[in-house]
Amino acid sequence: MEIKLEQLGYCYQKNSPFEKRALLDVNVSFDSGSYSAIIGHTGSGKSTLLQHLNALLMPTEGKITVGDREIVAGVKQKKLRDLRKKVGIVFQFPEAQLFEETVEKDICFGPMNFGVSEEDAKLRAKKVIYEVGLTEEILSRSPFELSGGQMRRVAIAGVLAMDPEVLVLDEPTAGLDPHGREEIMEMFYNLHKEKGLTTVLVTHSMEDAARYAEKIVLMKAGTVLQIGTPREIFAKPDELVDLGLSVPDVVRFQGLFERKFDVKLTKTCLTIDELTTEMAPYLAKGGA
């Protein structure tokens, strides 16, 4: 499912003394089946933009098109349930939203709230629990007996049970250890490929943006500063650092190598294998 934002703007408490501009003239599209990342310093508007993708927030200017549904600023919207069923959002620390007596009931809550029968919701719960790397026996347990990592997966299963066509991820690995972060990100990527999802990742991890995204949207102060492939975005690491962002370790090491040997490699490398291949001729000559 394609998403398109055109001249999108948003103000909190518009036309009041407390009006605050959060988004201004945002123009970006996310192709159906694509994997995109949104990056930017804290306060750049990433999470505000994210909440427009399933109409949790309504634009105060411009419009957003999600599939065949168009949301225009100032136009009253009806039947938003259909849109929200198609666009699933995994927020930071989603396990904080768990509340039911059992894992099964928690996973079933979303689908049943959107009109799915209890029987079908239970079938979905059995399916998605495996998709998030857990087993069926966990369905009868209280979510509050589980480890933090398991609770995170159960909360994600609740989003997947609604069978969304778009998956929006807002810092989905926040608070996890490195191993847990990698497992969760690989899980999302596999789901993205297997289900043909349109995936939008909001992240502070430049490693994840470089590794998974086909396109990166760079934001600053509520506006889109640049849109490009990971290679294009990370080709100017100094500009990202000036914005208060980090760069992938491979990109940082490439910069150190180029300065040390006073050379310019033929491309911005995003993996160790790419960097090794690019450096090999210079290392063979002893840095000539």
From Swiss-Prot:
Protein family per UniProt: Belongs to the ABC transporter superfamily. Energy-coupling factor EcfA family.
Biological role: ATP-binding (A) component of a common energy-coupling factor (ECF) ABC-transporter complex. Unlike classic ABC transporters this ECF transporter provides the energy necessary to transport a number of different substrates.
Signal sequence extent: none
EC number: 7.-.-.-
Enzyme class, spelled out: translocase
Topology relative to the membrane: Peripheral membrane protein
Subcellular location: Cell membrane
Keyword entries, A-Z: ATP-binding, Cell membrane, Membrane, Nucleotide-binding, Translocase, Transport
The UniProt record lists the keyword Cell membrane: yes
PANTHER family: ENERGY-COUPLING FACTOR TRANSPORTER ATP-BINDING PROTEIN ECFA2, HEAVY METAL TRANSPORTER
Entry binding sites for ATP: 40-47
Keyword flag Membrane: yes
Pfam family, one: ABC_tran
Species this protein is from: Listeria monocytogenes serovar 1/2a (strain ATCC BAA-679 / EGD-e)
CDD domains: ABC_cobalt_CbiO_domain1 (cd03225)
GO cellular component assignments: ATP-binding cassette (ABC) transporter complex
NCBIfam families to which the protein is assigned, alphabetical: ECF_ATPase_2, PRK13634.1
Protein name, UniProt field: Energy-coupling factor transporter ATP-binding protein EcfA2
Gene3D superfamilies referenced in this protein's UniProt entry, alphabetically: P-loop containing nucleotide triphosphate hydrolases (3.40.50.300)
PROSITE patterns linked: ABC_TRANSPORTER_1 (PS00211), ABC_TRANSPORTER_2 (PS50893), CBIO (PS51246)
Domain ABC transporter per the UniProt entry, residue ranges: 3-246
MF terms (GO), sorted A to Z: ATP binding; ATP hydrolysis activity; ATPase-coupled transmembrane transporter activity
Subunit structure: Forms a stable energy-coupling factor (ECF) transporter complex composed of 2 membrane-embedded substrate-binding proteins (S component), 2 ATP-binding proteins (A component) and 2 transmembrane proteins (T component).
UniProt main location, coarse: membrane
